[in-house]
């Protein structure tokens, strides 16, 4: 599973943050590891320099073997909260997707 993390100019994308988010994704999505080929994480601050509530965005794009990509997004007051909420959404979608595949 390849992980790529992207940030806009308003969200800190230092090496420590990238390593942290990569490790969290590997831990949270470990049971799907054999089905996921790539994960792209996009962080952004939709208000830029201005202050706003829930203006930090985390978009997760997951590429599965022989399937269409799955995309989930969340907004929160910090990139960390948006990330964790997006990961929870993603786990629900992946569970649902693989349950449907098992039924066929």
Language-model segment annotations:
Residues 1-104:
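N-terminal, polar/charged subdomain of small-to-medium soluble alpha/beta proteins
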